[in-house]
A protein has these predicted regions:
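A cross-kingdom feature that marks ATP-driven nucleic-acid transaction machinery
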Residues: 1-107
Length: 107
């Protein structure tokens, strides 16, 4: 499993990309507010990795929801939603989950 970021030569970027063998890539964009999300970078990313799942994480998302843009869908979640994705992808005892739980502040 690898955790990194993605950026192309034109400056499009994705905050976090999680790659696990045998699973679709997970692309995660972090935004202060979900209304601040611009799908342009995700659109370019998905042209290269069309099987990827893209999530926007924002503190103001009270319930997960999806939004359709052109020919792709983005899922909007809060920080607890990341924990749920990690549990689904890798089980309870992952280093990413441990790191998330060690972050200062409320979870």
């Amino acid at each position: 499993r690898d955790i990194g970021y993605w950026r192309d030569k034109q400056g499009h970027e994705i905050d976090f990309v999680i790659n696990q063998k045998g699973r679709p890539l997970l692309a995660i964009e972090c935004k202060w507010a979900d209304k601040d999300f611009d799908p342009a970078n995700a659109k370019v990313f998905l042209k290269h990795y069309n099987k990827a799942q893209v999530y926007v994480v924002s503190h103001n998302v009270s319930r997960p929801y999806s939004r359709r843009y052109d020919d792709f869908t983005i899922k909007f979640i809060n920080l607890a939603g990341i924990e749920n994705i990690c549990k689904f992808q890798w089980g309870q005892n992952t280093q990413l989950l441990k790191n998330l739980k060690e972050l200062p502040g409320k979870h």
